[in-house]
Amino acid sequence: MLTHALIGDEGRTIELGWQGGRRTRFHAMWLRDNALDDKTRSAGNGQRLITILDIPAETRIGAAEIKGGALEVSFVPEGKTVSFPAQWLSANAYDRDELREPGWTGDVIQRWTKATMQNSVPRASYKAAFHGRSVLREWLSAVRTYGFAVMDGLPAESGALCKVSDLFGYIRETNYGRWFEVRAEVNPNNLAYTNLGLQAHTDNPYRDPVPTLQILACVENTVEGGESSVIDGFAVAAALQAENPEGFRLLSSCPARFEYAGSSGVRLQAKRPMIELGPDGELICIRFNNRSLAPVVDVPFADMDAYYAAYRRFAELIEDPDFEVTFKLQPGQAFIVDNTRVMHARKAFSGTGKRWLQGCYADKDGLLSTLAAIEHSFKEAAE
């Protein structure tokens, strides 16, 4: 609840007091640009109807008053009065004293290890998720929070993985096709198409933008071995940062190069750090794929030894069983991973029997959009 509003700096700023003693400040220009009235933002989709050039450069707060659960602000020279709900102001306050350390993640992200996740893998049945919005919300929320989830009860048939992506968005087609087969082949153009074990990795780091989601569905599996593993790259990065801050800095500030040229007519290249931070230091992406790593040429000579030491330690932590959650997919099961965070691996399997998986890519914008829409509808229903 708002307790006071104090205009300062000749109307350029305003200080708000909150019950409990908290105080936040806002700039007049920021408030005017983010006004919630129907002349500034579309009532239908919330998109802004004006540009920054439509707002006078000399905009000031002429008057402000707390009315009920809102702050009413009058702007000059426009003579425009706008109401801001207190809850909205609190949620969008940017006047923060704390400085975040590089590598921070939002509150919605929960890092995990084998100890915390092996016996509590998030999962849902396809039928329940398809027919129940609450089940789908919980499953999508798990992907957002943990970076992966399992789905049971799919048809054990070719193309069933599309049913998973259809729950929230669209398949991202690549040079591998709309989806691709993961089974042993003669003369494969990718090590995934063998019965060899695969080191933990993220997929397609040679693309920019990288596919942000991957789905793997099991059609047939009668082999010995071949278990799937997932590793929380954010948890591993945090462990590296805790023991070797300088190594973390090098892997997050120096770009690596990735490339792929395994198919006729396809040559893919990308240059991004293995540990990618946003401009404000937020940990936003892990790219780790030994098979696709090109020569590292963007690290200063003086730092190359330290870079490789950090790279080696990062790989050692990724291989540490304490970070690995393992499960074996059965026909009709699939799992989804956030390809910007969670690495996946495969144990080697026998040459007898059959192991047939199918994989495809999708993007998080569709998943997060669907989740946000469901959460909004539940919130409206509760009001």
Curated annotation (Swiss-Prot):
Disulfide bonds: none annotated. One of its GO terms (cellular component) is cytoplasm. Pathway: Amine and polyamine biosynthesis; carnitine biosynthesis. Its main location: cytoplasm. InterPro entries: AlphaKG_dependent_hydroxylases, GBBH-like, GBBH-like_N, GBBH-like_N_sf, TauD-like_sf, TauD/TfdA-like. It comes from the Bacteria. It is an enzyme of class 1 (oxidoreductase). GO terms for biological process: carnitine biosynthetic process. Fe cation binds at H201, D203, H344. Its cofactor is Fe(2+); L-ascorbate. Keywords: Carnitine biosynthesis, Cytoplasm, Dioxygenase, Iron, Metal-binding, Oxidoreductase. One of its GO terms (molecular function) is iron ion binding. Binds 1 Fe(2+) ion per subunit. Its EC number is 1.14.11.1. Pfam families: GBBH-like_N, TauD. It catalyses: 4-(trimethylamino)butanoate + 2-oxoglutarate + O2 = carnitine + succinate + CO2. It is found in: Cytoplasm. NCBIfam families: carnitine_bodg (TIGR02409). Belongs to the gamma-BBH/TMLD family. Catalyzes the formation of L-carnitine from gamma-butyrobetaine. This is Probable gamma-butyrobetaine dioxygenase. It comes from Mesorhizobium japonicum (strain LMG 29417 / CECT 9101 / MAFF 303099).
